């Protein structure tokens, strides 16, 4: 039996509507009126997390918007939960993060926008907030799945745009703490998903235990130009595809000789596989 699910990882419908519920609802109404969207969501379970543009606006996070405007975090979380039928959306939680078990895959979607602590940037827990960090630690500790996916709206690695809005300029210690938790999952294959940077890229993240983490960042369905598809340091980059290349990512999972095995494919609008990575 084949189980299919679709994950949207930020900037998926709303674009920079700030604290305006009317404009936010209008963007989602236009999404809902699209026949291709209707057909796809009627046949494939879909979950989503946000990034800067469908949170508030470009590079905005936490409670501080452009020109020091206040981000109405609770309003935006409420609007989000009205528009996306995510797992655990009815839980009383300070954030839109959630987890779901999809066949053999444990999917963990992080909220990398609304929980940031602007006045503590550069400190431990400033990126996810202490509550979400504790939740992630506990969620990973109890997971018995052979495959674990962890997604966040912004990139895990620092190779693109000098990490101007992600872990590398916010919470390096917190990121390494999470990687340590992942290292402890010796019987699971853990993959990282991300978005934000226009284009599509894959990276290897070597770990001290000799294992390799993989990050797949797919943002090639948007219509805006973006940074160079390759970072200045290409030593750990698997591939790079520029923005407006109209491609989506696919992950398939199975056991190979009793061990968890995942295959990533990048597929363009014609159905051609333009990248294939066996992890």
Residue ranges and their predicted role:
Residues 1-279:
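Metal-dependent phosphoester/phosphodiester hydrolase catalytic core
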